[in-house]
Amino acid sequence: MNETAGRLGGAYEDISLPPVCGNNPVEVLIGGALSGSADPMDARYRTARTAGAFAVPLMFCKEGRVSDFAGVKQIQNFPGVTSFSYLLKKGTAIGPPRNSVQRAAYLVIHGEGTVEVNRILKKTWHRINITDTTGRQLLRNTLGYALNPMLEQTVETD
């Protein structure tokens, strides 16, 4: 499975790509590995295709020890959010950046276009709260990297 995830990029493609592609690439790759070949257009791999724009921002933490999370249900129920999850457990010690160990959460967002995706991203991003025992926010401010760079960055946050 790691080989499959590595070839797809390892960023929740099992959730984000089926509505974009109209099939499930993970299932196609596994089917091909098991049978020697797999046709992505085969009906058993087909899913409903959704028009619009998508984003899968990954969130990372600063150094510290995770004490608390907030906003899970609020973010999961936010219009346009297909999936959201915190990935670290309470008590996890975060060291200097080395690899994806600091990956703390992810979002899968869908909207009618990139302007709407950016709006949803900004509104949800500011509700993600990962703190240490002193209440210090551990989430790295990487929002600017997650926004569509082709758009003006003046979308309201509330």
Task: Please place each PLM-identified region on the residue numbering.
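Active-site "cap" helix and flanking loop/linker of ATP-utilizing ligase/carboxylase catalytic domains
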Residues: 4-69
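Generic structural signal for individual residues within well-ordered alpha-helical segments
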Residues: 27, 76, 115-118
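Glycine-rich active-site loop/lid that clamps phosphate-bearing ligands
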Residues: 59-93
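Active-site lining segments that contact anionic ligands and/or coordinate catalytic metals
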Residues: 51-56, 79-83, 101-104
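Short intrinsically disordered coil segments
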Residues: 19, 71-77, 122-126
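Generic C-terminus detector
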Residues: 89-158
